[in-house]
């Protein structure tokens, strides 16, 4: 912090202090309603929701769903009335929470709820109850009836949070939906989105958006208009996953053998030496590896060597462009991506590991052939590459919400990015109790081996003293390596990583017990608190789960349909209220717990009351022991590139004012240290005669580590910002195409748009035929018209083109419009309008898919424009715009062509039910860049089957897209020498 910053802070106070000054009065005003709300009966409390909703609609003067939230004044109007209702509404939620869950919102939680409602990010430390905080903003905004989306990082948290908070919402008459595995476009899926609040993962929300923009019937859409989203672990979703696109794809035809052939030669290539500026030293090797940027590329010597090994004449020739791309991907697979760090191999499948959470990214695949290259490297079955049908990044998806907010324990270090990319301000919410955790200076050793030994000795001492410890690692590989060291030192410990993530909740529930040692990857129980002495609620819920296991088994075996249905209902009810039941027992409200069990016809739960009391009593005793021993000790085994991830690990300790301690054990051989000067420091230590086991500690060294992290964070921010600039080009095009699709889907009659397109196509074609001449060639016009099967002779064409170009455009437009209207009148208009819509949607979907592929190819090679002293981004925008306009031109020409030539067999349409393109075998996956799967033929056949029985003439029109796939009109391509 500079001198001016310090002066400014002293005069005006810190942002945190200023935020607290504004938010505190909101909490105080909420408190004034508490006594009044307490006196209400349950029914009166529920009726407050109806009262609030009436106030909202009266203020805005219309139904909320009629409000156009794209207009700033409407957004402001809605926000104003909700601000007015806020204190009383928050008091209502607080009372409902006390009555249903036994939890009362603290004043700081009320402040957090206000921040979320304001469309900002609430930074709240671990253990401050973010899940409960969300209920305040959710309820207030659910009063609009527009739907609130609560976005979580995984299915477990979505289900847990929804079930945990449902009793509160139910008491207040707010409906809750959970996005699980319900079938896309199903009535069940639509019913979930029609709920007042929907809990789900970022992937589920994003994929539903893409799927909704591939449907062929408006009835198949499941999402409503976007209104408000609250993103939990907002830094993880909006920053860590910002570069991750969601992609719906089908397979592309590729030669699998090529991956094996290229993989075979990679070990034969030698790494080149580089100077201090990462420039290759000529003649020293075949490829340059840049670990900082995670990049690798061939040297000139390497190019010649690969050409020789693969028997290719010119690696950069037109015929070999695919080969050089796959050679580069194979180099990355071998030299940049590491097993058990970036990915792991399980049951013959390559699974990506999230570098930020340590979890396996289920269903995700690297794109552009990288995943296939890794599969070849690991000698597992290679799956097909994919072709993109629809895609969007999380950055652009979440920016579509008129109102967006988020919560996390670590956002302040990324505040600049949140504001610049999403226009989201970060408010740091004070903790309910002061943080009592000690954050010690890093303990640094020369070698990795010395660090591990020192760490093991430290952990052994903690365990012997009955102190719980959480040890964080940055990868599965290090996690398993440290586990071996701990076993050698006879340290009892639990291992938590991507390979056994299913036990996460159970392991974290015990992580706060005396002497417990938990070795975890960066996931560190995100979303699951470590409670000192052990988590009695989690353990109590586990007891109820035992009942559910037996009941599910019984339901599975039950033959009587009636009994089976009753048992299934009972299981769902117990599952929904199990946590509320356990919390009631733990808080001493035994009668309330019994009442809850009896209400759900679950006497089996009552039988567990004594066991839950016993668990709670033991947890109390253990908690006192742990508190006396100094609380939870958190030990980091390596620094992450982002300070935020380190802070997340630290934040596991010292929750709710508990004592705790955090410290990092580092070595100069760690990746971050090695890449930012660790080798130089190591040489200094050797020169000073320091031994391998000696600890190195100095303020300047700690400062240099933080500076290294800042550099990496800054670079990653620049990369994300740069990628967004490119993606914004595609986003504008996507919005235009999806807007056209929506117009088609929601219009009963699209003839005005079709007539407009006929006029545009006619004008463009006549100008094309005439060139720069004043007159139009009647013969060319005749050929063009006959390609539409109009059946006009040359005399009629001569008459139509009399009077120059403008007159020709007018006459020919009228001629085509007359033919179009005549065609529509010859058959049932309703059938024709449906056929028309089907044809338009089919053309858009097919051409959009091709356009996405072309834009990917453009993006891949655009960087080379920099060598010609041109700005690649500017070039991408210009080229992308031209390509998009060309695609729209092709769509319009194809539409006119097909509409004018369509033949409908009578009585065929009503027997065919139009299907969604998504009923086929298309797969959707998110990826670290993309993914794979599906059946390309399936979607094409479904699009065709979606149309009525249509017969097309086989003649190729002059203005049709050339069948060769060039994207040019037929007359400018293979039709040049074939005037028809």
UniProtKB/Swiss-Prot annotation:
Industrial and biotechnological uses noted in the record: Has shown promise in a 4-component vaccine with BHWA1_00430 (AC C0QY54), BHWA1_00569 (AC C0QYX7) and flaAL (AC C0QWY9).
Reactions the enzyme catalyzes: ATP + H2O + cellular proteinSide 1 = ADP + phosphate + cellular proteinSide 2
Cofactor names: Zn(2+)
Compartments, as annotated in UniProt: Cell inner membrane; Cytoplasm
Keywords recorded for this protein, A-Z: ATP-binding, Cell inner membrane, Cell membrane, Cytoplasm, Membrane, Metal-binding, Nucleotide-binding, Protein transport, Translocase, Translocation, Transport, Zinc
Bound cofactor: record note: May bind 1 zinc ion per subunit.
Ranges where the record places region Disordered: 954-980
Positions bound to Zn(2+): 962, 964, 973-974
Domain of life (superkingdom): Bacteria
Classification via Gene3D superfamilies: 3.10.450.50, Helical scaffold and wing domains of SecA (1.10.3060.10), P-loop containing nucleotide triphosphate hydrolases (3.40.50.300), SecA, preprotein cross-linking domain (3.90.1440.10)
Membrane-protein topology: Peripheral membrane protein
Any one of the GO BP annotations: protein transport by the Sec complex
Record-listed E.C. numbers: 7.4.2.8
PROSITE patterns (alphabetical): SECA_MOTOR_DEAD (PS51196)
GO MF, any single term: ATP binding
Binding-site residues, ATP: 109, 127-131, 529
GO annotation, cellular component aspect: cell envelope Sec protein transport complex; cytosol; plasma membrane
Subunit composition and interactions: Monomer and homodimer. Part of the essential Sec protein translocation apparatus which comprises SecA, SecYEG and auxiliary proteins SecDF. Other proteins may also be involved.
Similarity-based family: Belongs to the SecA family.
Annotated HAMAP family: SecA
Function per UniProt: Part of the Sec protein translocase complex. Interacts with the SecYEG preprotein conducting channel. Has a central role in coupling the hydrolysis of ATP to the transfer of proteins into and across the cell membrane, serving as an ATP-driven molecular motor driving the stepwise translocation of polypeptide chains across the membrane.
Protein name per its UniProtKB record: Protein translocase subunit SecA
Gene, per the UniProt record: secA
């Amino acid at each position: 912090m500079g001198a001016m910053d310090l002066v400014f802070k002293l005069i005006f106070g810190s942002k945190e202090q200023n935020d607290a000054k504004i938010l505190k009065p909101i909490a105080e005003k909420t408190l004034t309603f508490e006594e009044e709300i307490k006196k209400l009966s349950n029914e009166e409390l529920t009726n407050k929701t109806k009262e609030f909703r009436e106030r909202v609609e009266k203020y805005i003067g219309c139904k909320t769903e009629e409000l156009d939230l794209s207009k700033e004044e409407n957004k402001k109007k809605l926000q104003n009335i909700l601000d007015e209702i806020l204190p009383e509404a928050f008091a209502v939620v607080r009372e409902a929470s006390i009555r249903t869950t036994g939890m009362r919102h603290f004043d700081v939680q009320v402040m957090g709820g206000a921040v979320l409602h304001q469309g900002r990010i609430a930074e709240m430390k671990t253990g401050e109850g973010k899940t409960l905080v969300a209920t305040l903003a959710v309820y207030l905004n659910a009063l609009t009836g527009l739907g609130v989306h609560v976005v979580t990082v995984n299915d477990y948290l979505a289900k847990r949070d929804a079930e945990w908070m449902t009793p509160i919402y139910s008491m207040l008459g707010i409906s809750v939906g959970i996005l699980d595995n319900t079938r896309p476009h199903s009535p069940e899926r639509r019913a979930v989105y029609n709920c007042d609040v929907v809990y789900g993962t970022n992937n589920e929300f994003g994929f539903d958006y893409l799927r909704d923009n591939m449907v062929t019937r408006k009835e198949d859409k499941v999402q409503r208009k976007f209104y408000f989203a609250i993103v939990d672990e907002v830094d993880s979703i909006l920053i860590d996953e910002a570069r991750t696109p969601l992609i719906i794809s089908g397979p592309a035809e590729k030669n699998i053998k090529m991956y094996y052939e290229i993989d075979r030669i990679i070990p034969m290539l030698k790494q080149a030496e580089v100077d201090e500026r990462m420039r290759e030293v000529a003649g020293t090797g075949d490829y340059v590896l840049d670990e900082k940027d995670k990049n690798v590329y061939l040297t000139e010597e390497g190019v010649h060597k690969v050409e020789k090994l693969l028997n290719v004449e010119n690696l950069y020739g037109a015929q070999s462009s695919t080969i050089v791309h796959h050679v580069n991907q194979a180099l990355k697979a071998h030299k940049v991506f590491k097993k058990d760090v970036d990915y792991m191999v399980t049951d013959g499948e390559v699974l990506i590991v999230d570098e930020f959470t340590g979890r396996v990214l289920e269903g995700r695949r690297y794109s552009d052939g990288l995943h296939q290259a890794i599969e070849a490297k690991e000698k597992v079955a290679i799956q097909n590459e994919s072709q993109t049908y629809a895609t969007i990044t999380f950055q652009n998806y979440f920016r579509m919400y008129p109102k967006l907010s988020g919560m996390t324990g670590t956002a302040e270090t990324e505040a600049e990015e949140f504001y610049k990319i999403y226009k989201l301000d970060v408010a740091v919410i004070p903790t309910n109790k002061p943080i009592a955790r000690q954050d010690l200076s890093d303990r640094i050793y020369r070698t990795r081996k010395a660090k591990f030994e020192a760490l093991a000795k430290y952990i052994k001492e903690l365990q012997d003293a009955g102190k719980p410890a959480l040890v964080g690692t940055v990868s599965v590989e290090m996690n398993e390596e440290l586990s071996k060291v701990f076993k050698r030192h006879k340290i009892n410990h639990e291992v938590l990583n991507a390979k056994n993530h299913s036990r996460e909740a159970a392991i974290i529930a015990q992580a706060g017990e005396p002497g417990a040692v938990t070795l975890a990857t960066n996931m560190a129980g995100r979303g699951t608190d470590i409670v000192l002495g052990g988590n009695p609620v989690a353990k109590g819920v586990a007891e109820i789960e035992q009942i559910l296991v037996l009941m599910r088994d019984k339901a599975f075996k039950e033959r009587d349909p009636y009994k089976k249905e009753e048992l299934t209902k009972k299981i769902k009810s117990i599952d929904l209220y199990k946590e509320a039941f356990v919390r009631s027992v733990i808080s001493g409200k035994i009668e309330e717990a019994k009442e809850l069990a009896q209400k759900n016809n679950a006497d089996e739960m009552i039988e567990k009351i004594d066991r839950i009391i016993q668990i709670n009593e033991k947890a109390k005793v253990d908690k006192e022991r742990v508190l006396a021993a100094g609380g939870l000790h958190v030990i980091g085994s390596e620094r992450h590139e982002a300070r935020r991830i380190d802070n997340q690990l630290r934040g596991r300790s010292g929750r709710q004012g508990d004592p705790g301690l955090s410290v990092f054990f580092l070595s100069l051989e760690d990746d971050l240290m090695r890449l930012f000067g660790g080798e130089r420091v190591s040489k200094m230590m050797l020169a000073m005669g320091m031994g391998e086991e000696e600890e190195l500690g100095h303020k300047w060294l700690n400062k240099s580590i933080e500076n290294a992290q800042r550099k990496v964070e800054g670079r990653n921010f620049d990369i994300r910002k740069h990628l967004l600039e490119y993606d914004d080009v595609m986003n504008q095009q996507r919005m235009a195409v999806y807007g056209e699709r929506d117009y088609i889907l929601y219009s009963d009659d699209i003839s005005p748009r079709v007539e407009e397109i006929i006029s545009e196509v006619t004008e463009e074609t006549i100008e094309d035929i005439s060139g720069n001449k004043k007159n139009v060639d009647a013969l060319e016009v005749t050929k063009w018209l006959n390609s539409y099967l109009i059946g006009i002779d040359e005399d009629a064409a001569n008459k139509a083109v009399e009077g120059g170009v403008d007159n020709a455009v007018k006459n020919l437009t009228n001629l085509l419009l007359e033919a179009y209207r005549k065609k529509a009148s010859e058959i049932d208009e309703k059938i024709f309008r449906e056929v028309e819509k089907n044809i338009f949607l089919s053309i858009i979907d097919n051409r959009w898919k091709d356009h996405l592929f072309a834009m990917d190819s453009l993006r891949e090679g655009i960087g080379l424009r920099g060598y010609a002293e041109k700005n690649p981004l500017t070039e991408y925008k210009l080229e992308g715009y031209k390509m998009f306009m060309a695609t729209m031109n092709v769509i319009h020409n194809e539409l006119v062509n097909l509409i004018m030539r369509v033949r409908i067999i009578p009585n065929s349409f009503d027997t065919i039910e139009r299907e969604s393109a998504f009923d086929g075998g298309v797969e959707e996956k998110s990826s670290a860049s993309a993914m794979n799967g599906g059946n390309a033929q399936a979607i094409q056949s479904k699009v065709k089957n979606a149309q009525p029985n249509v017969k097309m003439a086989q003649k190729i029109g002059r203005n049709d897209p050339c069948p060769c796939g060039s994207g040019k009109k037929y007359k400018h391509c293979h039709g040049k020498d074939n005037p028809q």
